[in-house]
């Protein structure tokens, strides 16, 4: 079972923790990790915009986002991250420590880490579905969620382009899973990395053959969420497609569009 353990990483992880200090890593280290993951996931999609070969994988072929709108979006996202997300991490630091989150906790086994990631995706998706659906009603949409829909044809960095209150509301769903299943910072950072890739990818505007959408059943991905931005309603879940199917909120023409695309590919 040693092969299913992360013990081989522990010495390097604990040296890293000793060097920077647990106090720094829990708050500021997590923020830095967030920034590295977020922009690290976005940059490949940004590069793809400059390579003609990838143009055929764009979902909304007729819509372009100019540099002015992308720059404005990037500035607003960074301001939200620095002025909202970082203070949130600092404010909740005592609560995080109170529940026992530690950078020095033993690392989980690989199976338990995978279980935590899958469970966190399911929990976050369920929370996001209902919170997101609620944000499409009345004053919640008019004064809060409408900001996120400024871009009908999204690109990766728009994932966190949102009203500050929405950032707080939807951010809660991201941390529930890892806090329920683990108390170690390593797992939280791994989850943060995969979750940020998921949200950046589903806002990327690209449907590549190697995208999770085409590999994992019930995975929504960019085509699923891009449709939501295009028509402003339906397809509310963040990661999977089954909740929208169960509760009857799948986009009316989404699946007919997917079926048509599959037929065109087979011809």
UniProtKB/Swiss-Prot annotation:
It is a multi-pass membrane protein. The histidine box domains may contain the active site and/or be involved in metal ion binding. Pfam families: FA_hydroxylase. A motif (Histidine box-3) lies at residues 224-230. Its cofactor is Fe cation. One of its GO terms (cellular component) is endoplasmic reticulum membrane. It is found in: Endoplasmic reticulum membrane. Keywords: Endoplasmic reticulum, Iron, Lipid biosynthesis, Lipid metabolism, Membrane, NAD, Oxidoreductase, Steroid biosynthesis, Steroid metabolism, Sterol biosynthesis, Sterol metabolism, Transmembrane, Transmembrane helix. Its EC number is 1.14.18.9. This is Putative methylsterol monooxygenase DDB_G0270946. InterPro entries: Fatty_acid_hydroxylase, Sterol_Desaturase_Related.
């Amino acid at each position: 079972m040693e092969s299913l353990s992360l013990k081989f990483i522990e010495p390097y992880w604990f040296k890293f923790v000793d060097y920077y200090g647990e106090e720094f890593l829990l708050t500021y280290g997590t923020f830095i990790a967030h920034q590295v993951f977020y922009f690290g996931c976005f940059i490949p999609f940004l590069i793809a915009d400059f390579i003609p070969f990838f143009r055929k994988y764009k979902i909304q072929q007729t819509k372009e986002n100019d540099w002015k709108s992308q720059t404005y979006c990037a500035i607003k996202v960074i301001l939200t991250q620095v002025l909202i997300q970082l203070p949130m991490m600092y404010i909740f630091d005592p609560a995080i420590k109170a529940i026992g989150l530690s950078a020095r906790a033993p690392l989980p086994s690989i199976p338990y880490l995978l279980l935590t990631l899958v469970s966190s995706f399911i929990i976050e998706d369920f929370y996001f579905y209902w919170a997101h659906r609620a944000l499409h009603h009345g004053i919640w949409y008019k004064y809060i969620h409408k900001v996120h829909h400024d871009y009908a044809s999204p690109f990766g960095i728009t994932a966190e382009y949102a009203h500050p209150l929405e950032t707080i509301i939807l951010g809660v769903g991201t941390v529930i899973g890892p806090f329920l299943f683990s108390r170690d910072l390593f797992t939280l950072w791994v989850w943060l990395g995969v979750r940020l890739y998921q949200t950046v990818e589903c806002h990327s505007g690209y449907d590549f053959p190697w995208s999770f959408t085409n590999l994992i059943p019930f995975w929504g991905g960019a085509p699923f969420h891009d449709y939501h931005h295009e028509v402003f309603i339906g397809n509310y879940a963040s990661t999977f497609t089954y909740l929208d199917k169960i509760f009857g909120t799948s986009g009316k023409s989404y699946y007919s569009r997917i079926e048509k695309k599959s037929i065109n590919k087979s011809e």
